[in-house]
Amino acid sequence: MGVSDDDRIAAAQSYIDGLVTHNGDAVPFAPGCIRIEQGIKTGLTGNHLRRSLNRGPQYRVIAATTKPEYTINGDEVRAVYNVLTKASLGGRRVAARVDEAFVIPAAADKATIQHIRVRFHPFAQRI
């Protein structure tokens, strides 16, 4: 049957929304989903990632994201967007340009996130 590109993008968007709302309950993680951030494994399982979104202090500083630009290549859904934090100093807010790749197989019965790989580049944004 397969999963549509729109459903795969919606699964990735639910993760990005969870970063801002600090609620990972609606994110369709596969049980064995892992997350690699800047080359380091930071997510061990789907449940671990969900708990991190719900209660992790590392996500509490996130205030908003910009609308992601999505591209799809095979089973990979790539999202490029900015994360805006609550942290600011001297009229500038800490932000980061994020390039995140989600493995969400097209041939599956439903859109579930199998793997996340993220790279980000911090910058200061005028408020």
Task: Give the residues covered by each predicted segment.
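C-terminal and inter-domain tail/linker signature
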Residues: 1-127
